[in-house]
Amino acid sequence: MNKLRKLKRDTDHRQALMRNLATSLFKHGRIMTTEAKAKDLRRVAEKLITIAKKGDLASYRRVLGYLYEEDVAYDLFQKIAPRYQGRNGGYTRIIKVGPRKGDGAMMVYIELV
């Protein structure tokens, strides 16, 4: 059974965090976050790209219900998903940056390949 990280947040806060991170990732192409958040975000982002690759209206509405910005969902379908048509998974890359100065948490870049 897959164990999900709780990230010291309740369910609603954790889901909102993932929606925010996914929206930012698709908007900017690359974001810096902690390693634990990036590993959870990778699962979410890869599933959203796989859904977007279908390209039908039901898929668009499903993605639109998850992401916070409509223009980001549009870009996901028109620009991002077509790049990965011949690729089965592995749409993101995690690059370690080093520990954060304040608390030593491992910081990483997560980016679209």
Curated annotation (Swiss-Prot):
Q: Which InterPro entries match?
A: Ribosomal_bL17 (IPR000456), Ribosomal_bL17_CS (IPR047859), Ribosomal_bL17_sf (IPR036373)
UniProt GO BP: translation
What quaternary arrangement does the UniProt entry report? Part of the 50S ribosomal subunit. Contacts protein L32.
One protein family per Pfam: Ribosomal_L17
- Under what name is this protein listed? Large ribosomal subunit protein bL17
Record's keyword annotation contains Ribonucleoprotein: yes
- The organism sits in which domain of life? Bacteria
Q: Which HAMAP family match?
A: Ribosomal_bL17 (MF_01368)
List, alphabetically, the GO terms of the cellular component aspect. cytosolic large ribosomal subunit
Q: Which NCBIfam families match?
A: L17
Keyword Ribosomal protein annotated: yes
| Cited PROSITE patterns | RIBOSOMAL_L17
What PANTHER family does the database record attribute to this sequence?
LARGE RIBOSOMAL SUBUNIT PROTEIN BL17M, RIBOSOMAL PROTEIN L17
* Assigned protein family: Belongs to the bacterial ribosomal protein bL17 family.
What GO MF terms are annotated?
structural constituent of ribosome
Designated gene of the protein: rplQ
* Record's keyword terms, sorted: Ribonucleoprotein, Ribosomal protein
